[in-house]
Amino acid sequence: MILFTRLLAVSLLLVSGAFAKFQEFDDSDDVAEYDDNDFAEFEDAADEAPTLRPPSQQVPEKEDEIEDDDEEEEEATVELEGQEEFEEDTEGQEGDADAEPYDDEEFENYDDRLDTGTPNKNNDPITIVDVPAHLQNSWESYYMEILMVTGLLAYIMNYIIGKNKNSRLAQAWFNSHRELLESNFSLVGDDGMNKDAVSTGMLNQENDHIYNMWCSGRLCCEGMLIQLKFIKRQDLLNVLSRMMRPVCDQVQIKVTMNDEDMDTYVFSVGTRKTLIRLQKEMQDLSEFCGDKPKSAAKMGLPESMAVLAEMGEVTDGIMDTKMVHYLTNYSDKIESIHFSDQFSGPKIMQEEGQPLKLPETKKTLLFTFNVPGSGNASVKDMEALLPLMNMVIYSIDKVKKFRLNREGKQKADKNRARVEENFLKITHVQRQEAAQTRREEKKRAEKERIMNEEDPEKQRRLEEAAQRREQKKIEKKQMKMKQIKVKAM
């Protein structure tokens, strides 16, 4: 019973306390806001703190009221002290937060708003800096791009113009020479694309500045290759270099003769400067024409021309009246004429020394003509080369008819034997080294085959066979040495 009365008293106290707390709210207060605010009671206590009056204005009251006031003042003082401590803690937390570094991107344009909202007299005045000239949006800022685009356009225009001009010059040459070529050759313009030879009647373009034409079907020769080598007019850099060093367009004609239609000799005529260069570069001229180019003034040719010949008889036989006429009247267009039964092209330069075999030779007539105009050739200049093609046709017939006498033939044969002997002497050491290398490789392969044999009996038989072969080689060498000694005695 006593326990029940105590519980009832405690519950009544709790209900009365809750009712008193509820009475503290105004009608306008938000209950949820009060529940969420943990420090609401401290704020209410601060609001209800009594204001102290001066001692002169205080009215004496009863002792009970004075004691009650003292207790309330002590409670208010405690509450105010707690609130002040809480405010100090919050201020310390805010100071710590201010001390921490913050991200500039998170507070972008924050300083600008502060400056516009609260003007500061201590800030420096705003100064507008001039934009540098190279950053301004004007045509002067793009001078490099303008130069590059201009250069590219100039290169493209030069390529188109140069390519078209080379094509026009080649077509002009062919139109002026077509009738002569078709009257002397049954096949004109074979491109080699078909198994059977077919006359296309047109030039073959190798690239933008070289045009080819193959003609065949004529007596005395296997065929004739014509090459039109124009200046690289499509290349702007080449055009600029020609301003410092002018060059000419060239027409090169190579006639391959039949073996029975040309005798054994080497002959060349042309400008002195060109012959000196060819004598150094060409294999046949350097071997069979050891003398320096001789002047052709005795034969009625201009002073600028010279002659290289294996024998004097060849010069007298080739340089007849008609050939002298062609060379004299068209000396400004003729750079070189080269007749050779030992033609193999330029010298072969190898890093490891001389080649072990003589180069393959063919009986060839080689003509090199310069197009007039000094690099500024026109259609009329290409048509003016027609008489030189007549000279080529005449030279083919002339070479077929010309024959050396008996002494000249013997001298030519001696010269060829001498050249071959000199070549063998030069390459003798290299051929010995090559033969020794082949023998060593053969022995090494034989030893490897014996070592790889798994059957001991078969391996022994192979070793005995190899020894017998070596013994036979030694006996043969000894027999040769004995025969040489007997002949010497």
UniProtKB/Swiss-Prot annotation:
Functional description taken from the UniProt entry: Component of the multi-pass translocon (MPT) complex that mediates insertion of multi-pass membrane proteins into the lipid bilayer of membranes. The MPT complex takes over after the SEC61 complex: following membrane insertion of the first few transmembrane segments of proteins by the SEC61 complex, the MPT complex occludes the lateral gate of the SEC61 complex to promote insertion of subsequent transmembrane regions.
Task: Give the protein name, as stated in the record.
Answer: PAT complex subunit CCDC47
According to its UniProt record, what is one Pfam family this protein matches? Answer: CCDC47
Kindly list the GO CC terms recorded for this protein.
endoplasmic reticulum; endoplasmic reticulum membrane; multi-pass translocon complex; rough endoplasmic reticulum membrane
Q: Which InterPro entries match?
A: CCDC47
Residue intervals annotated with topology Cytoplasmic: 21-141
List where Basic and acidic residues composition bias occurs. Answer: 436-478
Q: Which residues form a coiled coil?
A: 428-489
Q: Where is the signal peptide?
A: 1-20
In alphabetical order, the GO MF annotations are: calcium ion binding; protein folding chaperone; ribosome binding
Look up and give the membrane topology term.
Answer: Single-pass type I membrane protein
Q: Which residues lie on this side of the membrane: Lumenal?
A: 163-489
Q: Name one GO biological process term.
A: endoplasmic reticulum calcium ion homeostasis
**Family to which the UniProt record says this protein belongs:** Belongs to the CCDC47 family.
Composition bias, Acidic residues:
33-47, 62-103
- Which species is this UniProt entry from? Xenopus laevis
| Places the protein is found | Endoplasmic reticulum membrane; Rough endoplasmic reticulum membrane
Q: Give me the stretches of Basic residues compositional bias.
A: 479-489
Bilayer-crossing regions: 142-162
* Assembly and binders: Component of the multi-pass translocon (MPT) complex.
**Where is the segment annotated Disordered?**
33-103, 430-489
Grouped into one coarse class, the protein's main location is: endoplasmic reticulum
**Keywords for the protein's UniProt record, in alphabetical order:** Coiled coil, Endoplasmic reticulum, Membrane, Signal, Transmembrane, Transmembrane helix
